Amino acid sequence: MKRKNYTTFAAIHLGSEMLSMQITEYHNTDRYKVIECCNRRIRLGEATFKNKIIPFQLVSEICEILIGFKRLMKEYGVEEYVMQATTAVREASNQVFLLDQIYNKTGLVVDVVDMPKEIYTKFVAIRNTLKAEKVSTEREGMLMMDISSGGLGVTLVRDEKICYQGNFHIGIIRIKESFERNRRESMHFNKALTEFLSSTIGPVRNELGDSKVRYLVLSGTETELLLRMLGLDEQQKVHRIKAADFHAFFDSMRQMSLPQLIQVYKLPENVAELVLPTVLLYEQLLHLIPAKEIIITADRFIDGIQLLHIGNKTNPVMRKELEQELISLFHTIGARYLYDKKHAQQVERLSLIIFDKIAKAYGMGEHERLLLRATCILHDIGKYICMRSHSIYSYQLIMSTDIIGLSEVDKEIVALASYYHANRLFDKTNTRAPQVEKELVPVVAKLAAIVRLADALDRSYMQKIHSCTVTLKDNKLKVLAASKEDLTLEIWTFDDKSTFFEEVFGIEPILERVNK
């Protein structure tokens, strides 16, 4: 019987190796209970990574399993659900047909998440587990490595800030499918695979430099296999292992042949084939950065789906903490391209004052506020490439960067707003201008118009305005800027840039200086 004031929620994950559902009754992030778990093995990864298509037989199998899941959802009285698909579906050329069949046969809507969003969802779950375990990054940082069937996410966290984040297409199943069977059985395979992995993750080594961390946090689908081989309880939420013990384990694994692995660890051949890629990948990752302790968590992608859903519904404190971590990542990206931090922070501060005054009336909420902050921080990073036409390079750099927590559409909005804060929208004479899809025009225009005004208020890059208030009355946005400095350049630039804001919002911006 459902508890009073509790909501029943189903999280469904269509992964590369497993189709899973978790049904939960929740009141908030502290008061919830998982009441049903279903896991059905499907081998999408092996088919998709090699042939880029999901066979018809698997499509039918997926739909049959989901029909069963729907019956369970009805029995439990599920009121809310989120269904997400990851790597295998994301890369399938027949993705559209799969999603259409799922919807027509089950009524379920599937959100296909991109890799940065996938890594972020896992990051949220792991972060929550480590906080419960009192694992802190205040003094000594941690490097989080999530390995899935099709990808690898590497995140460096120090002082509760994301200092580095990178994602790579080298998951365990993908590695296995990258080499034909006769190559995997070659006596040269170990060396070739080691060199392949080393060259692939080389950029991470360069980015991390001489960084040191206390904790190396491992998660992902293959950690269950690792725990089994280490003789540890797979059901336990967190395992802590000394780095030296981990290295010793890998040394022993590297010496074993496939038949020996099957015999010693009682593994099926198809599972034993994954051991060597797993061991060699972990070994390469361990060499990236010295760590004193290895932490292995049992958190799955589906746990992240659940936590994000419940947190967004019930926990504003958690939402704020997660937002601040994303802001730290935006600044990390800005610093990589030698941005002017003081200018970025000033533009962000002034933009938010304007945004908070007009957001509700113009259909903007918390998510648009986050995208605005990202735009303010990153709008000038193109100057790292070239001072002339820097906005096109800002657009290209943002589009080329993985930003966990932002979807591809979110990232495109930030990139476009960064470009159009300095360029005219719908300028047909500008052949280099990135195209804006029709449905994105309103949000891109609104964010770009706000950043354009705020940028004008710091045109000198000298942060002359130390405080600012905004009033909105009779379609006039009055900006009262407090400063003891000469604001002539800012006033002139504000007047030049205000036309676009007026076109977008139907509000006339007026700047008044206040001597304070």
Which sequence ranges carry the predicted segments?
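Short coil-to-beta-strand
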Residues: 32-42, 163-170, 322-323
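Short flexible coil/turn linkers enriched for glycine and charged/polar residues
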Residues: 5, 15-18, 75-78, 104, ...
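Helical "lid/coupling" subdomains associated with nucleotide-phosphate turnover
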Residues: 9, 47-71, 75-76, 88-93, ...
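A structural preference for short, hydrophobic beta-strand core positions in alpha/beta folds
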Residues: 83, 112, 296, 511-513
